[in-house]
Amino acid sequence: MKNKKTKILVLYAMFIAIEMLLVFIPFLGYIPIGPLRATTLHIPVIIAGIILGKKGGMIIGLVFGLSSLFYNTISPTVTSFVFSPFISGSILSAIVAIVPRVLIGFFAGVIFEQFCKHKWNQYAGIIISGLVGSLANTILVLAGIYFIFGQSYAQA
């Protein structure tokens, strides 16, 4: 029992370390494309959801969300007001920065668990979890921007 807890703790530490490396190594986690930043930070969150389950994916997703909030605060671009309440003055920015990222790990974990539970093809479960996690990030962030900051974002 003790070895399993240690293994889980080490996996959490590794995923958090990977997230932090992606955040702080230039052009690796955040890729500047004009005034926007594409991200690869959702990839470890999806993998954590698959390996550690929905709870683990949500925890690593929280790290992604908090790092997004932090990074957009210390290194702002034209659109950083959407992800940082310190720039926009609205706590709703924190919701856009954190909630979709937490849900990436949740969705990836739930879908993979369902594939394993029903004894379906595990490789298909990994692929579909990855696709759904990536789409969840994109759709939920864009929906948050549209519904909360639609007018302001259009002007930026």
Language-model features, listed with the residues they occupy:
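Loop-helix junctions at membrane interfaces
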Residues: M1-A156
